Amino acid sequence: MINNSNDIGFIQDIAGLDKLRQKAVNGDENAGQSALTAAARQFESIFTSMMLKSMRDANSDFKSDLMSSQNEDLYRQMLDEQMASEFSSSGSLGLADMIVAQLSTGQTASEQKGEDGFQEAMRRVEHARKTASERSNEDLVAAVYPLRKTQAVQSTQFDSRHSFVTKLKPYADKAARMLGVDSSLLIAQAALETGWGQKMVKNARGNSNNLFNIKADRSWQGDKVATQTLEYHNNVPVVEKAAFRSYASFDESFNDYVRFLENNPRYTNALDHGGNSERFIHGIHRAGYATDPQYADKVLRVKAQIDQMNLYKSPAGIFRRHSFSSSIFSAYQS
């Protein structure tokens, strides 16, 4: 099997394809062989993507107008393309091996061996098709919000939504007191951004602990990780590459979230209405925190789910806002 060190990454990474072309044209013999291997894997991923598309088209007549939408079709297409890339990256089908063997200088193969290899590849393709058809729609949502270049990291820290809430609650409570907002709202925002902790951005150590998907701008001096993300421009979803902040702990993530809001004047109006969850989340949304036109409503729906867990008994408005620099973290009755 070919070496998988040449990560083909995200299937729509055009810049990566251009680098591959330059390597093939300008590199030495070893670089050319490496480029051939990567190109073979790209071809395999395209073939697999076409196979998955044909499978989806065959089932299009069974779709329900009530349960389907254009956004769902877009997300499913993006998921299928990324699945095709991952199949090729792991060498699941074997087509790339055959291409490299046929095109590499000095390598020959008997016709019988080629025929056997083709039949084996077709068996692997059929297995991949069955695997893809069994993927649930829940995987689709988790794979694209947020969309990641790195393969999804299944967190071992949260084995359920209840676990996600209970483990983050102490950090959220502290941050909520500093901002003067509802603690469950912060957890809801983190749940939406990370798929309940199952889809956080991956760095060299594992999860980046970035619960709020705050990007690493020029002012950020800490660790960062590059990834693909789904942004909206004029209500149209677009895949972009961006750098995100990386933290050593969840506590750091919550603390930086507080600093991020308090140090940006555009969020001042939203912070002035922290006692009202709807006005606060809609306020930071309008100020540019997220580009998804439905972002605030999605956060509020997740918050309603968390509130039903009965983990929050404090009355509304129990917290007053404190500056991040303040060392007072006690709650005051309003």
Swiss-Prot record:
Subcellular location field: Periplasm
Region listing for Catalytic, in residue ranges: 160-334
GO biological process, one term: bacterial-type flagellum-dependent cell motility
Residues annotated as catalytic: 231, 256
SMART domains assigned: LYZ2 (SM00047)
Chief location category: periplasm
EC number: 3.2.1.-
One Pfam assignment: Glucosaminidase
InterPro entries: Flagellar_prot_FlgJ_N (IPR019301), FlgJ (IPR013377), Glycosyl_Hydrolase_73 (IPR051056), MGlyc_endo_b_GlcNAc-like_dom (IPR002901)
GO molecular function: amidase activity; hydrolase activity, acting on glycosyl bonds
The entry's keywords: Bacterial flagellum biogenesis, Cell wall biogenesis/degradation, Glycosidase, Hydrolase, Periplasm
Catalytic class of the enzyme: hydrolase
Cellular component per GO, a single term: periplasmic space
Family to which this protein belongs: In the N-terminal section; belongs to the FlgJ family.
Note: Probably exported via the flagellum-specific export pathway.
Function in brief: Flagellum-specific muramidase which hydrolyzes the peptidoglycan layer to assemble the rod structure in the periplasmic space.
NCBIfam families, sorted: flagell_FlgJ
Name of this chain's protein: Peptidoglycan hydrolase FlgJ
Species of the source: Vibrio cholerae serotype O1 (strain ATCC 39315 / El Tor Inaba N16961)
Species lineage: Bacteria, Pseudomonadati, Pseudomonadota, Gammaproteobacteria, Vibrionales
Gene that encodes it: flgJ
